[in-house]
Amino acid sequence: MSSQIDSSSVHQDEVAKANQRFYDQIAKIYNKVDRRRGDHIDHSWVDRVINNMLSTLESTKVGTGELSFMDAASGSGFLAQRARIFFPRITLLDISRNMLKEIDLPRALKVCSDACFIPAKESSFDVIGGIATLHHLKSPKKFFQESYRILRPGGIIYTDHDIESQFVNNFRPILWFYRKLFDHGKNYLNHCPESSEKDYLLSEYHGKEGLSGPKLAEQLSEIGFQIREVVY
């Protein structure tokens, strides 16, 4: 697959629209092509992460209302499916309306919107989580700013499964070979010919070179978050 896009000249809105178009087109085949989050794999690690969040919330939560969780850029709804066991209020946020339609999660609120412009009031959520979210955004910092705005005092933002730039630099030859064998982009395009390779590449904005963990942590701190843990 070609990867010749001058991403430096791409506007944030172009990246958002590419995500919207591409995932609207492949929504029906998404889970068939990318089976990494299927029930055939043990995902109990997510429950441990959520339990750690709950322990943190117990010591910081203000008020007695029902705990609320937002799955930001929810995709297949993988994170929300695990979180619903622990959180009475679940919100799914995704820029693709068709992806949201594919998620079977009764009583969850579905919101079709850009994760960098979240239509929610201040102090609305206890936890905002994103699995493989940040690399789809041209500016993860804008998502962090929105998250800070809508999280309640003592709330938590959790992100995971975005490739780190130092990892890419350290293992570039091995990663190149792995991607040759297991690149989901080719499979998406083969299963959905009407989808666009350009949209796919734009949607994976930071997917090729990764994101800097220290830089993301610095941005979070500048916004006002306290960093509990950085693992990569």
List the model feature ranges, each with a label.
Residues 129:
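A conserved beta-strand element that flanks and buttresses the S-adenosyl-L-methionine
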Residues 199-215:
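Acceptor-substrate binding/catalytic loop of class I
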